[in-house]
Amino acid sequence: RTPFVEKGIKKIIEHSYVPVIRNSGGLGVIADEGILNISYLFPKTADSASTDHAYEKMVSLTQQAFPELQIEAYEIASSYCPGTYDLSVNGQKIAGIAQRRIKKGIAVMMYLSVNGNQTARGNLVREFYQQSLDPLRPDNSYPSVDPNSMVTLETLLERPILVNEVKER
């Protein structure tokens, strides 16, 4: 949907990433070895039918995995791929949640920033949009990404943490 997406994709490739179109979620994210992508699939029931209820299951799971952090769910508008169910600590986004309704079930997917250079990820997404959008026609449906609006679990916990350790939680 961006008029100059080829230029944006070129920028992503220059940074040694492979562009992929996701089947859920709204806007772009960066996936690398410091990011954990989690999918939570469950059957569609009367209890789980609401969109918010499905999101709340993932929020609860994440809060239980990290009781030492005050994880809240609300939109961080200056992050990349902002949404109502951004997970944040102290106003900085650590995760984004999307969902997809499937035949007899629900798939809730989360992008969780575990470790690595989150500022560089944010800068790359900002550069992607700067290259992909028409500068003469501003489009407010894309975020003006502030790389400082996002943070890793490793930074918050003030200790090294690996993706495998997060999986065990």
Explain the meaning of each model-derived region:
Residues 4, 50-58, 162-166:
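Short amphipathic alpha-helical segments
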Residues 68-69, 104-169:
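Long, positively charged amphipathic alpha-helical accessory segments at protein N-termini or as interdomain linkers
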Residues 7-11, 15, 61-69, 131, ...:
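Generic non-transmembrane alpha-helical segments
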Residues 72-125:
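A contiguous pocket-lining binding segment that forms or flanks enzyme active sites
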Residues 28-33, 100-103, 143-144:
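Short glycine/proline-enriched loop/turn "hinge" motifs that connect secondary-structure elements
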Residues 1-46:
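N-terminal lobe of the biotin/lipoate ligase/transferase fold
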Residues 35-77:
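Contiguous, small/hydrophobic- and glycine-enriched helical/loop subdomains that border
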